Amino acid sequence: MLELRLVQGSLLKKVLEAIRELVNDANFDCSGTGFSLQAMDSSHVALVALLLRAEGFEHYRCDRNLSMGMNLNNMAKMLRCAGNDDIITIKADDGSDTVTFMFESPKQDKIADFEMKLMDIDSEHLGIPDSEYQAIVRMPSSEFMRICKDLSSIGDTVVISVTKEGVKFSTSGEIGSANIVCRQNQTIDKPEEATIIEMQEPVSLTFALRYMNSFTKASSLSEQVTISLSSELPVVVEYKIAEMGYIRFYLAPKIEDDEEMKP
């Protein structure tokens, strides 16, 4: 038996909006410690990892580990029927091929039940090792979203370069080129507006902007985004979900032509 009650129902709606463009079908894994998802996008370029810890739910019951295959677009349609202030409960019986979403209005004068068929989805769990990164950038998520959106009007890729000067986002396309530099600034009274750069060594990597723009759909979940970069590893774009967990996006860098790689 599975029963999860989330007072901030809007949180689940935001999570779905953040990932459904990248991933069509995915398994939600429930265990005694939390509700999680790990899935590749259809082109196997990006990976999404979500964790909502059990402590963040008002009520969390998971008698045994359960994996529920869901079509995320169908799930998003159901969640759109919930009001932003509604309390959402997810229920599933052991061995059942359906999951029930229950939406309660805050005054509890209206309760709606939606039942959705589960799917059998073959998915392999990738072990994601904890790695040391050459550079870690923390910045306002709204700023990162704006930069990715602005650069998309010029080019298809973004070069993210971290040096002691700051973090630079660059692109070029048929109409020209653009560079946006963010320098470290720590706002004591407004930590959510700070840009903090931890650099072991300079790093410069190229990524597809369409994926970065897709990742920024998670901006509504967190005021800050953390971007972890290393030349040998996929970038990690992480949004913390207040007191509950995180959503992380992993994206392999684009390899430049050999000619361009020569110093």
From Swiss-Prot:
DNA-binding region coordinates: 61-80
Stored CDD domains: PCNA
GO molecular function: DNA binding; DNA polymerase processivity factor activity
Keyword Manganese assigned: no
Keywords linked to the UniProt accession: DNA replication, DNA-binding, Nucleus
GO cellular component, one term: PCNA complex
Top-level taxon in the UniProt lineage: Eukaryota
Compartments (UniProt record): Nucleus
Any GO BP: mismatch repair
Pfam (any one): PCNA_N
Family under the similarity heading: Belongs to the PCNA family.
HAMAP family: DNApol_clamp_arch
Free-text function comment from the UniProt entry: This protein is an auxiliary protein of DNA polymerase delta and is involved in the control of eukaryotic DNA replication by increasing the polymerase's processibility during elongation of the leading strand.
Record's protein name: Proliferating cell nuclear antigen
Organism, scientific name: Zea mays
Taxon lineage: Eukaryota, Viridiplantae, Streptophyta, Embryophyta, Tracheophyta
Gene: PCNA
